[in-house]
Amino acid sequence: MGKEFRKPEGRPVFPKKAVITSGMPYGNKELHFGHVGGLFVHADTFARFMRDRIGAENVIFVSGTDCYGSPILEGFRKQQESGVIPANMTIHDYVEKNHKIQKDTLHAYEIKPDYYGASALYRGAEHHVESSKELFEALYERGQLKMMSTPQFYDPEFKVLLNGRQVVGKCPIEGCCSEKGYADECDLGHQYMPSELIEPKSMLSGKTPEIIEVKNWYFSLENFTDEMQEYINEVRANTNTRKYILNTIEEFLKKPVIYVQKKLIAVNPKTYTGEGAPDKDAFDAAYEAGLAELTAAFPAHEIIAEEKKPSVTFVFASLDDRDKARAALAERNINCRTGKTLVPFRLSGNIEWGVPVPECEGNKDLTFWVWPESLWAPISFTKACLEERGKDPSEWKDWWMGGDAQVYQFIGEDNIYFYGIAEMAMFAAADAEAGKPVKIDYKKLPQIIANRHILFMEKKASSSSEIKPPMAKDLLAFYTPEQLRMHFLSLGLSTKSSSFKPQIYLPENEREGVDPVLKEGNLLTNVFNRIVRSCLYTVQKYNDSVIPMGVVDEKIKAASEEAILEYERHMYNHDFHRITYVLDDYIRLLNKHYANNIKKAEEEGGEALRDQLLTDCFYGIKTALLLLHPIAPTGCETVREYVGLSEKVYDWNYAFADMKDVLANPNGETKFLPPRFDFFLRHESQLAEMQEK
């Protein structure tokens, strides 16, 4: 076995330990198709592969329900008011109910985290309070936190401070096309201060809220621009992190800017005395006068004024300078938009439902804002998982920061700012030696795997948008988990946004051809089923159900090794759609090899040719099982049982081994296969439809 597993040149190197995380769904809802198809299937497939590749004991796959935050509070309030949930239900019971439904849905999709926790529930919640305290104190002791008085929305009608999604307006970031801007972030992940939100409305009263000053803890993220740029340069040069992720991060590493429309500068009330907008002939003079006045009023800055662009860009050295310029514009009733840059990252809030912030400098009764605490929640879940394994929870550091370990975090592209910037700077700062410069070392930090949007019928669908996504569990009334897993992986979310277009959601008169959701699954339910059945029926008929142990044809062996290495490379790069291409090519090659030779063997009565064919094809089935196991585990287990293979067939130490090395029965005996047997099943609704046709 050892000599079989020699590494060819250029083969990817995997860590000895791996933590895989998947983005946490909110505790106010069930899982919709985007949660499962856009993230969880990818994370689970990679986790299953890593268990096979480096050993299950060396892999921890965690995720959980995001229990806190304004979306959960709002969901709870609305459902109680509308009578969807009982009036006496507590918010704790509310998130626990949704957590259990989420967990059941993941199980139904054969998604198997080692620990699926909840930030407010069970033992994981206890670890989460501890992790939150540890990180806060580490950052505070290293001088990375500051108490800031910042504006917050207040609804005078309801007499409450408004958080997160209790306020909706337009994102102030130049060029942003998000549907909704919330209190201090938009639904595309842009960060800004509440006072920057354009046309805010309270979700409680529907009226424009007031702004009052409140105190909160902030992490000094704005000080890490240079360190983040150095980190990005190293990640770009030394890792396989997706380039668009790095490009997205770099967009935020720019100096603070504001954009002001030229037509607004021209009517600067400090310089313009006319009525209405200046006409074309007078515009240039009015614009130049207004610009000169602003230039004198602003702190030191650079001006970018391109002739063909309708706005002027003012570039500042610091956020303070930018905000002084914004104040000067506000004094003149001139609107502006801001650009992407690093801003202080809020850690605390004032809603009661949250993880408590340690009392510090006399500030008490604060809770952590949901976004930062959800970044370290996977650490809390790792602690809980280790504890369940009988290990010391303090070993989490070996898994998250050990030299032989790697953390892989599967997220959606809208959350790159939080995971790719705020998390990296916070984790590095908390681990730094007090009083020393912070080095954001990519070798001690997670690798971010951000998928693009999964659309529904070519449109972006989410629980908070006009187009509502189908619930994940509802899809299982029409498709099997394995069919959906194959299809979701094939969508190519590593490179582009792709649309999920199940025909069952189309009117019957609009349905044409084969349902696209079934295309990849047909490789299993048609082609692979056929080759496995054919081989088993043939050994039953001619070989007393015993697999012949000959020498595998060189072409089949070479094709198998090529498929293994190509698959491994794509899995290393998290290019899941390319994995489906490898599987399609390889399994169809096996099927063609069998079909082209079995007839010849039977016509010529060639026992030797038939045995050679069976030797080749069973070796191919062994290889296909290794590659399919992370994607379609149940069907693979059924094949393994009937072919008579041990669990070594899934172990990458045996990837290039001979057939005899992975047999459950040394003599190669297979299990009797009844007629018309399927290993990979179609959904019963599909069978009924086939019978009708």
What feature does the model see in each segment?
Residues 75-96:
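A charged helix-plus-loop insertion that forms the helical arch/lid used to bind
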Residues 1-15, 148-153, 166-190, 200-204, ...:
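Basic, alpha-helical terminal appendages of large translation-related enzymes
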Residues 101-182, 225, 229-237, 252:
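A broadly conserved sequence feature marking short terminus-proximal activation segments
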Residues 35, 462-463, 468-693:
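Structural preference for alpha-helix termini/caps and helix-kink/transition segments
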Residues 94-106, 419:
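Structured alpha-helical segments in the cores of large, soluble enzyme domains
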Residues 2-56, 60-63, 67, 130, ...:
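Structured secondary-structure scaffolds
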Residues 162, 178-181, 192-193, 208-211:
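Cys/His-rich microdomains that often coordinate metals
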Residues 65-71, 75:
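Short, charge-patterned binding micro-sites
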